[in-house]
A protein has these predicted regions:
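Short acidic, glycine/serine/threonine-rich loops at helix termini
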Residues: 52-56, 82-85, 105-109, 132-141, ...
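A glycine-rich helix N-cap at a beta->alpha junction
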Residues: 61-72, 115-127, 206-213, 499-512, ...
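Flexible, low-complexity linker and terminal segments
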Residues: 2-26, 30, 156-409, 414-415, ...
Length: 716
């Protein structure tokens, strides 16, 4: 169950010629694919492009009507390998995944695809997970474009430009027999807007038809001597064809004055930021009209040399706004100017940050510095300074005004008790060498658990601990999620451990979904999926690959059992890897699934019991060990109105979802017995209501009796 449903929104994909589409960026990309006559689509979920996969899943009926093959691939490599269908056949295909980690995984298939070239249009839609909101290492997709000679599109972040980029991408790919990457930044994926639609097109050749008439071209296979010819073909044929297409179709855009003393070159994705900075300087109006010449690179690779030189003609200085590092575009343009003996002064990273996302303030400051140096007459006196001060001051004070809030597990997360159990084991036995993996469980490396020190790639947690299997007083422990397990972990981590007779402990955290990417189904998901095969146990897979010591914990909230199973894995004399599969459903997905049903049941007048937990103020000792071992967001502190008790007690707020982890932790760690469970009954029966009234009456009598026996002191 994905975190977001597009069942209603996908109906917009049926819009016909001349109708207006209003919606989100990823939905617009899907509509553009259908308008282009795509024959097959695939991909692997991952922010910021996860919702594109969710849209495709919810649009399967529409895809089937158009004879479009859709596949939710096991990994980015599997997705990219799908594009092999466009090598010999004139079929348009598109795949999607996040970048750069997705491209890292897909790089082998991507390089082979680029070497042999394509006949049909091949488009890779990458979500550039860079800057604020990113969850990965900060790198750029540009390196892969230049390494494998794949054309890179970076459209202006508005729906008409994005839709046009999809259309241009397919045509550019076919014109140059080269795959194309379409880069969408985080905000571009979710930008809202409108565009005029065209009719959806069935593929001119479907994959079904192609299967009935197989084709092969030996010279397209990446095998010597053909692979040597591929490299020469890239330079002599494909590159010139791409440059001519970009130039003739005017994929890059020029705005502002036709001539001027200075100019600004930017990636298409930076256009909005540059225009906003110009507006703040009084050099552009609300509609983006400006007198500053702008050269917008909707295609950032390859560059069109004569086009760039024409833009530079008559200018004394040009600013390159290129987000991230290295400065691929700026360096390439500097080389172009050098070869052309140009006299233009090129500026970029000297006035803009070398690395990191270019927020509005960065672009404003860089543009201001550039203008002050090369065209001070264009800079209104005092404009930038008057606008900068409040922003700078508020930024400096922000860390003082807002407390640090590191990411953590969700309330009720079934992975929290796993780390509580592991922390108890470490408190008893000393620190363990723990390797983490990509996924929600990586939050265990932060407070209050602070377990795990590395993450080397999706599904590579156990493999990253391989060097520590050489003995020692404690066995190494590796943590991997079910999503990472099926993505890469079964072979690269568990299979590797079996083959090398690893003595380590592999802890597979199974929450029934690829939860961190949005709750998509995986092979071991328990839900029935009409188009996918689910219900394949992880334990069966690890046994099938050769692991012998395998234990299952089917309720991670049972902290004592979880702790004891970990101890058993650390103590056993069995040779080979010790695998623990700890399973409980992701609380977010469980709430999405159960809450509508519960609300309907309550509305229908039926009896529903909801568990809630609390802390007895009189019993709580105030040492807060429960908070340190649990870290649940629902656990907070409460100051008592009691002069004899200085320390605040633990308190459970209304965000509690009733998972019971707090009580289980207190019981397993033998803490104070202050936690209690209270059942909230909706639509109780007559007997329950009567018992409730009698109970309240009895409690009132006892409280009044107690009050009479309390000593009182009269003021003197």
């Amino acid at each position: 169950m994905a975190e977001r449903s597009f069942k209603q929104e996908v109906e917009k994909l049926r819009l016909g010629p001349g109708e207006e589409f209003r919606g989100e960026g990823i939905l617009a990309v899907t509509k553009a694919l259908l308008q282009c006559g795509v024959g097959y689509v695939g991909g692997y979920q991952g922010a910021p492009i996860s919702h594109l996969m969710d849209v495709l899943v919810d649009a399967q009926d529409i895809l089937e009507e158009l004879d479009v093959r859709f596949e939710a691939n096991a990994s980015e490599a599997a997705a990219c390998a799908m594009l092999a269908a466009s090598v010999h056949y004139p079929i348009r295909g598109a795949v999607t995944f996040k970048a750069p980690v997705g491209i890292n995984v897909a790089s082998d298939a991507l390089a082979n695809l680029s070497s042999g070239g394509v006949t049909g249009g091949a488009l890779v839609v990458v979500g550039e997970d860079y800057g604020e909101g990113s969850s990965i290492m900060q790198e750029r997709s540009h390196a892969y474009a230049t390494k494998s000679q794949i054309w890179l599109l970076d459209p202006r972040p508005n729906l008409p430009s994005i839709v046009k980029a999809v259309e241009d991408g397919f045509e550019l790919s076919e014109a140059s027999n080269t795959p194309v990457m379409l880069e969408l930044r985080i905000r571009a994926c979710h930008v809202y807007g409108s565009f005029m639609t065209k009719a959806n097109r069935r593929p001119t050749l479907s994959v079904t038809q192609a299967l009935n008439e197989p084709k092969r071209q030996t010279d397209r296979i990446v095998l010597p001597p053909a692979s040597y010819a591929h490299e020469q073909e890239k330079i002599s044929q494909r590159w010139p064809a791409a440059v001519e297409f970009i130039r003739s179709r005017q994929l890059n855009e020029v705005f502002g004055a036709a001539s001027g003393k200075i100019g600004v070159v930017m990636q298409g994705g930076m256009y909005n930021g540059v225009i906003r900075a110009l507006q703040r300087l009084g050099l552009a109006d609300l509609y983006g009209e400006t007198r500053i010449p702008l050269y917008v690179l909707n295609v950032t690779y390859p560059l069109v040399e004569d086009e760039f030189l024409a833009f530079c003609k008559g200018k004394s200085a040009v600013l390159v706004v290129e987000e991230g590092q290295p400065a691929y575009i700026e360096d390439a343009m500097a080389a172009i100017l050098y070869r052309a003996r140009g006299s233009v002064q090129l500026s970029g990273k000297d006035v803009l940050p070398m690395a990191g996302e270019y927020i509005g303030q960065h672009v404003l400051e860089g543009l201001t510095a550039f203008l002050a140096r090369h065209a001070p007459e264009e800079l209104p006196a005092g404009t930038a300074q008057s606008q900068d001060k409040p922003i700078a001051e508020s930024g400096n004070n922000l860390s003082d005004a807002v407390p640090v809030r590191p990411p953590s597990f969700c309330t009720g997360c079934p992975e929290r008790p796993v780390f509580s159990a592991l922390k108890m084991v470490q408190q008893e036995r000393g620190s363990l060498q723990v390797a983490g993996d990509i996924g929600c469980h990586l939050f265990g490396s932060l407070a209050p658990f602070e377990i795990g020190g590395t993450t080397m790639g999706y599904g590579l947690g156990p493999a990253s601990n391989a060097a520590f299997d050489g003995g020692g007083s404690q066995r190494p422990v590796s943590i991997i999620g079910d999503g990472g397990f099926w993505h890469n972990g079964l072979t690269s981590s568990v299979g590797n451990a079996v083959f090398n007779k690893s003595d380590g402990v592999v802890l597979v955290v199974d929450n029934f979904y690829s939860a961190a990417t949005g709750g998509q189904d995986v092979l071991s998901s328990r839900a029935e999926n009409r188009s996918k095969s689910t219900g394949h146990p992880i334990s069966a897979a690890v046994k099938g690959i050769g692991a012998e010591w395998v234990r299952e914990v089917n309720d991670t909230y049972d902290v004592a059992t979880m702790r004891d199973t970990l101890k058993a894995a650390l103590d056993t004399d069995h040779e080979g890897p010790k695998v623990i599969v700890a399973s409980s459903e992701c609380m977010l997905n469980r709430q999405r699934r159960e809450r509508p049903v519960v609300n309907q049941t309550i509305a229908a007048g039926e009896r529903v019991v909801k568990p809630r937990f609390g802390v007895d103020d009189d019993v709580c000792t105030g040492d807060h060990a429960c908070i340190r071992l649990s870290g649940c967001p629902s656990l907070s502190l409460k100051i008592l109105d009691d002069p004899l008790r200085d320390d605040p007690v633990a308190h459970i707020d209304q965000s509690c979802v009733g998972c019971g982890n707090c009580g289980e932790v207190a019981d397993a760690a033998v803490l104070c017995p202050s936690f209690y469970r209270a059942d909230v009954v909706h639509n109780p029966g007559w007997f329950e209501r009567l018992r409730h009234r009698l109970t309240l009456g009895l409690i009132g009598i006892l409280q009044r009796r107690r009050s009479r026996r309390v000593l009182g002191f009269e003021p003197v």
